[in-house]
Every structure is written in C-alpha cells, then in structure tokens.
Amino acid sequence: EDLSLVGQPENDYDTGDDBTAADPDSNNTAAALDVRRPLPSGTRVRRPPLRHRRLAPGAVMSRDPPASPRPQEAQKAIRDEGGCMLPESDLGVLCPTGCELREELLKQRDPVRYKISMLKQNLTYFINSFDRMASDSNTLKQNVQTLRRRLNSRSSTHVNAQKEIENRYKEVKIRIESTVAGSLRSMKSVLEHLRAKMQRMEEAIKTQKELCSAPCTVNCRVPVVSGMHCEDIYRNGGRTSEAYYIQPDLFSEPYKVFCDMESHGGGWTVVQNRVDGSSNFARDWNTYKAEFGNIAFGNGKSICNIPGEYWLGTKTVHQLTKQHTQQVLFDMSDWEGSSVYAQYASFRPENEAQGYRLWVEDYSGNAGNALLEGATQLMGDNRTMTIHNGMQFSTFDRDNDNWNPGDPTKHCSREDAGGWWYNRCHAANPNGRYYWGGIYTKEQADYGTDDGVVWMNWKGSWYSMRQMAMKLRPKWP
C-alpha cells in the first residue's frame, strides 16, 4: 500500500557534535546518516577474551559419527504451535513465505495502478479542456458584446454584419455546449468505471487479507530426528537444512524451527529471517513475545527446506539461552549478490521482567561490530547512542529505548518500523521495513528515518538488505 510522509521529525542524532566525522572506508558519508538523539554518556563494554570449541571426541556432548539408518517409525502427532492443521500424524506442517493468492494480487497491483494513473490523466485532460472552452466562450461573448456596442453606434449599413456575427456566435456556442456535454458524459462514464474497479479491488484485497492472515497448511514431512536445539539434532545425525521439531526442556512442548546445517559449521537454530517482505515486522509486544510469520515451506517434494520470513519469539529466544550459553550469527546479503556476517561468541537476553535486556560479547566477522561498537561512521555521543549491547527490547506499544525515556514523541520502534534492542536508535535494524531494491529515501519512510533492514557498518543507513537471518547455536566449553 502507498505510504505517505507523516511529518518531518527532528533529527535523530546530534548534528552539532563537533567530533562527528566520516569514515573514509564507508560507502556512506556522515551527512547521509540520520544523525540524531544525543546521549549524555557512553556505554562501556567489558569484553573478556572468549574462545569456543566443540568437545573433543569421546568427551561429553561430542558429535557422534552418523548413526546407521534405522527403520523409520511413525512420527507422533505433535500439537502445532503455529495454528496449522496436521493433515496426517506422520506429516509435518510448515507455513510458506506468503500465500500464492497474495503473490498473485501483488503481481496485479502495478498494472492496475498504471491503468488508474492513465484514467486520472484522461480526467485531468478533460477538465483542462472544459476550462479552456469555458474561457474561450467567455472571451467570445465579450467580443460580441463589444462589437454590438460598436455596431449600435454606427450606421444601419452594419446591421447585417452584426446579425451575421450573432449567428456565428450562436453556432459556436451550440458547438461548445454539445462538446462539453459529450466530454462530461465521457468523464462520468470513466469515473463510474473507475469507481467500480476500485470497489472490486478493495473487496479482493479484503478477501486476500483474510486468507493470508490464517496460517497456511503444507504437506511437508518433518524429519523424525529431534533434539533440544538444532546443534543437538546435528549431533544426532540431522545434516540437511530444513524444518525440525525441537524441545529445549522437558517442561515445554516441542515446536518447529528451521535448522541451518551448512553455514559456519551447521547446527544453527534460525530465530529470525528476512527474505521477501511477506511478513510485517511492525508488531506489538505480545506478538513479538510469541511468534509470527512462516517458518518454512516446501520445494514441491514434501520437504520443508526453504526458510520463510518470521520471528521465533522473544520468549523462545530467552528459553533457548537458559539451558546453554549461546552464540549468535547474523548472515546478510545485499541486492548485488554480496554476503557478509557478524558473529558474537556470547548472546544472552534477560527475562521479560527485565525487558529482555541484551548482552553480547566477543565479535568476529566482516559485517562490522554494530551491536558492541555502534555505527563506525559516527563519532562521540552520536556513535555511542547506536550501541545495542545492554539495551531492552522495544516495540511500538512498549517503549524501552534510551531516547528521552518517558517522552511519547521520542519512540525508536515506532519510527524504525520494528521490534528490536534499540538505543537512540540503532546501528543495526534487522526487523525494520523491507525495501525492494536496497536503496531507499527519507521520502519513502513514514517518519523520514532510516527504518529499513539496516546494518549501518556495512551498507549505511539508507540501504535495506535483501536477506537477513539471526541464528543461535550453543557455545560449548
């Protein structure tokens, strides 16, 4: 749907900071950044040197060699947390990225908009033509009146000329009136056709929204192998990247996740994924706490090995980190085909009572240390206010950011279009608005802020990623 600029907001960063400077290696200058929201003091982060390794063979939790195939047992029907119906007890269920009907509607949107635009242009043309004809008629009438006055003052020899002019005036008037009437009829017909078409579109959109709001059911077989998390499944023999059931503890019911068994050694539980903009990430606190989106969909061969667009839930993310210290991996790709990553050896959100406050340590990768160091293009307080470590989770209805706490007009989540661990406001915004093509502008954003799927240390404020995924894996001692 079309978005309009609500208003020109205040700059998010302190443009008067004397120590703001541009990073020569960045693709974006400081002038292109959203310099805003000054912070009186910085954040000091203690980063103890951490290393991690997998257990040696024979030790506890070591990866066993792949077990010999066993006869496949009938899989127990498990209650689906996503709301889909299990067609059979031995079939898994996973929801696709988007419904086919929604995709078809999106394909038809641009042609319909183009036709509407052309109809509007025709309407404008008819209105302008009518105005010109009305102006011409008034001018002609004035000329006739002038001539009449002149003829009245002259001799009777000019009476015939006067009658001829009047007759011609009547002819022109009749012609103009008939033309205007025809134009008005044409305009009325066009408007009625346009109104009917828009009504049909509104009804179709309403129907598609109702269909797409319900979880979609797919006939994908979920592998029998399971575990506490994807790393556990990897050690139990699961080697393909697809949807699995996990059960982090005995007190919780199993639920579906997408496991990345290939990237950076495999065993990653994907807790967030952005691929096509099919899911709206501007959600409230309770929705982020639970789960939303589509975990995965099939490839036509009854295998759910294509990840969808979703958020696994802050409650679930916290649950995964209670049993083991977790690493976090951010994989991202741009619209030109390049990919980078950012990995942190320790990732720990606190519980809901603490606002799921985030703590990360020990960065590695080539995307830039956005969570611990903030946006490297900025300096001083402008940079400090973009650090995410130590921040609470915020949504548009739960303002926990560090931007003038208590002031409802200063709200990062509302302006940046997603839920995240905002400071004042961000160097990374994985849950922001999805923009096709990468580059976007202030005019496209609702509040004029950099609200895209952003990782500033790689592509700056005004480039939205094509793909962004957040993955967890236990860090073994």
Curated annotation (Swiss-Prot):
It is found in: Secreted. Residues 1-76 are annotated as: Disordered. Conversion of fibrinogen to fibrin is triggered by thrombin, which cleaves fibrinopeptides A and B from alpha and beta chains, and thus exposes the N-terminal polymerization sites responsible for the formation of the soft clot. The soft clot is converted into the hard clot by factor XIIIA which catalyzes the epsilon-(gamma-glutamyl)lysine cross-linking between gamma chains (stronger) and between alpha chains (weaker) of different monomers. Disulfide bonds join C220-C304, C230-C259, C412-C425. One of its GO terms (cellular component) is fibrinogen complex. Heterohexamer; disulfide linked. Contains 2 sets of 3 non-identical chains (alpha, beta and gamma). The 2 heterotrimers are in head to head conformation with the N-termini in a small central domain. InterPro entries: FIB_ANG-like (IPR037579), Fibrinogen-like_C (IPR036056), Fibrinogen_a/b/g_C_1 (IPR014716), Fibrinogen_a/b/g_C_dom (IPR002181), Fibrinogen_a/b/g_coil_dom (IPR012290), Fibrinogen_CS (IPR020837). It comes from the Eukaryota. Glycans are attached at N27. Keywords: Blood coagulation, Coiled coil, Disulfide bond, Glycoprotein, Hemostasis, Secreted, Sulfation. Residues 221-476 form the Fibrinogen C-terminal domain. It comes from Petromyzon marinus (Sea lamprey). This is Fibrinogen beta chain. Residues 44-55 have a biased composition (Basic residues). GO terms for molecular function: extracellular matrix structural constituent; protein-macromolecule adaptor activity; signaling receptor binding.
